[in-house]
Amino acid sequence: EKAVGNHPFCVILPDDFIHAQHNHNVSRLVEAFQETGCSQLCVMSVNGPDISKYGVVEPGKRSNQVYRLVEKPSLEMAPSKIASIGRYVFTNSIFESIKSIGVGHGGELQLADAIDRLARNGKVEMVLLEGSRFDCGTERGYLNAILNLADRRKRVRENTLEKDIPILEASKYDKVLDMVDENFFTEKTF
């Protein structure tokens, strides 16, 4: 709070890796903030039970308005398929919101709860993600990011993946990812 003072600021969560042809998602958030003065969330559509891994937006009446943000709801309780991901622009009002919330999901202070409080005052909007998002906060997600990005780079694909891991070409990673379980990344593996 002392570092940013009264200035708006960006928050980028490091376990959300975003790959886009033009890396401008944060710029789009900043531009939207400059137009409206509202805090901004980067969002994406999530189908099925994976929605319970995210803060989920209940859209407001205005275009791009966030009415509510619900932290990790069940599929049945999710207000939409719009998930907040780790890119934000906030005004300094987020700090008062954080101070006013109690312990939330998982017994921790949740940024989503603070955002929800701001949203209920009509001060939060959303910008749709452009590109692909990878959850590098899990071993499986991290491996998925590595394999997908390597496959996009012709030189890496030709010199490594197609020679050393030929199963990838036929399966598009599913077989490799299915071989990965919670024990794959233990010290015994290496």
List each model region and its residues:
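Conserved beta-loop-beta/alpha segment of the NTase-like Rossmann-fold superfamily
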Residues: 1-59, 90-92, 97-101
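A short linear-motif detector with a strong N-terminal bias
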Residues: 19-22, 34-38, 66-69, 105-106, ...
